[in-house]
């Protein structure tokens, strides 16, 4: 059982690029922080404001689910006002909860549902319904949850046990979503939960829990959490650093571009793709300005650049998992080859992103190889200059990535389904119209 896709399959045609762009931008709120501003921000009882909440389809899905649990949300001009009854008073029985396309929503809310003891069926769309869930169900059930599923996929049937015990858990894969699920369930459990990471992953959950004064301790790769008194606090969602990647790519690939992105999330783990682009030779600088709810925020300056290929080790891959498609495209226009180590997790995203990258780069004339889970991009492409058809595989990051290829194509670029971009970057054409001639 799954919810059917709702995309309208609307194609997009790009009629070439603009050679010069000089502009300053502010971006919609970061999707990862946006999810957590509700999922974690609404755990304590009380009222708070969220500024710059992203309007992406995934984040709106999270908002709807929190309302179903009993959280009241009022959308005002400059912020959204959240009034939460507190996790102790969340509704305990809901027929089903639909996570749409959002893997983050499904895995994080699963930890909360298990910890609170909600009886429900957790479902998603066709894409989400084939993504692996055993990785969260097994640790939750070992804590005392009662969750059933068929094979490794949604729907997840929560029996509403609600009496979890802390767990000592060593991560089997590098996944911020799995880690976050266990930490949230651990916070809502009796006793201490310890999570050990094989390699570090994104830490937005830890930062947000610490911001609302949760009892969480972090030492090297071990995280320890237990239930404690927490407080409602206002949250500002910095500009989305993942969406920024596509605008940055357009500027790098452009002939004469210079852009500034203001008030962007500069979390140390999330900005690693910027460091990789700098290593490749990108004319790129970022400057931290301040902190908001435990996250670093600042500005990014980018200019058109000539790049060289690099090798990206497996220890870096978990940090840049969402940016590998766009770095792969940029690497196609770099001198030499670029190697991404241990990219297997890309198979389990909204699409098989390894396949999507290789299929579309081939259509551009770029040679790629997959050798023992290492993705190799052979650069050297200068211009495309032919009509190309991009297959998005209904994946927002693939659509956004290969839109950027049009910065080197004087002919038409056709994208088969642009509507899927609403998952993460709605109204993105308001930004990209500065770079492209768009039908």
Swiss-Prot record:
GO molecular function, one term: 3-phosphoshikimate 1-carboxyvinyltransferase activity
Binding site for phosphoenolpyruvate: 31, 103, 131, 177, 353, 397
GO CC annotations, alphabetized: cytoplasm
GO biological process, one term: amino acid biosynthetic process
Positions with a binding annotation for 3-phosphoshikimate: 31-32, 36, 175, 177, 322, 349
NCBIfam families hit by this protein: aroA
PANTHER family, per the entry: AROM/DEHYDROQUINATE SYNTHASE, PENTAFUNCTIONAL AROM POLYPEPTIDE
HAMAP family (alphabetical): EPSP_synth
Protein name: 3-phosphoshikimate 1-carboxyvinyltransferase
Species, as recorded: Clostridium tetani (strain Massachusetts / E88)
Gene (name only): aroA
């Amino acid at each position: 059982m799954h919810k059917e896709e709702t995309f309208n399959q609307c194609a997009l045609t790009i009629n070439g690029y603009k050679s010069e762009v000089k502009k300053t931008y502010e971006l919609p709120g970061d999707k990862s922080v946006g999810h957590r501003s509700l999922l974690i921000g609404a755990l304590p009882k009380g009222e708070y404001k969220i500024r710059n909440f992203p309007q992406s389809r995934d984040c709106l899905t999270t908002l709807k689910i929190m309302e179903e649990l009993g959280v009241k949300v009022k959308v005002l001009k400059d912020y959204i006002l959240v009034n939460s009854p507190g996790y102790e008073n969340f509704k305990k029985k809901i027929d089903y909860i639909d996570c749409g396309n959002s893997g983050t929503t499904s895995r994080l809310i699963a930890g909360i549902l298990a910890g609170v003891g909600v009886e429900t069926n957790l479902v998603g769309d066709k894409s989400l319904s084939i993504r692996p869930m055993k990785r969260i169900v097994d640790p939750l059930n070992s804590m005392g949850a009662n969750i059933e599923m068929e094979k490794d996929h949604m729907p997840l049937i929560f029996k509403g046990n609600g009496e979890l015990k802390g767990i000592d858990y060593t991560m089997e894969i590098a996944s911020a979503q799995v880690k976050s699920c266990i930490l949230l369930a651990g916070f809502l459990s009796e006793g201490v939960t310890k999570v050990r990471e094989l390699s570090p992953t994104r830490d937005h959950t830890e930062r947000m829990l610490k911001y609302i004064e949760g009892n969480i301790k972090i030492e090297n790769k071990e995280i320890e959490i237990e239930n404690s008194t927490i407080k409602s606090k206002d949250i500002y969602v910095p500009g989305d650093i993942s969406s920024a990647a596509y605008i940055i790519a357009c500027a790098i690939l452009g002939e004469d571009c210079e852009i500034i992105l203001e008030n962007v999330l500069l979390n140390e783990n999330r900005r690693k793709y910027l460091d990789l682009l700098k290593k490749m030779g990108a004319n790129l600088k970022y400057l931290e300005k301040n902190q908001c709810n435990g996250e670093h925020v600042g500005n990014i300056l980018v200019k058109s650049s000539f790049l060289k290929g690099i090798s990206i080790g497996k220890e870096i891959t978990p940090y840049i998992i969402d940016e590998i498609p766009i770095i792969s495209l940029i690497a196609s226009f770099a001198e030499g080859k670029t190697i991404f180590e241990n990219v297997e997790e890309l198979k389990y995203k909204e699409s098989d992103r390894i396949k999507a990258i290789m299929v579309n780069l081939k259509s551009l004339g770029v040679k790629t190889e997959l050798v023992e889970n290492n993705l190799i991009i052979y650069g050297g492409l200068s211009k495309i200059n032919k009509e190309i058809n991009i297959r998005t595989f209904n994946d927002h990051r693939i659509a956004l990535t290969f839109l950027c290829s049009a910065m080197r194509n004087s002919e038409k670029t056709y994208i088969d389904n642009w509507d899927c971009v609403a998952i993460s970057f709605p109204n993105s054409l308001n930004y990209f119209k500065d770079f492209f001639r768009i039908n």
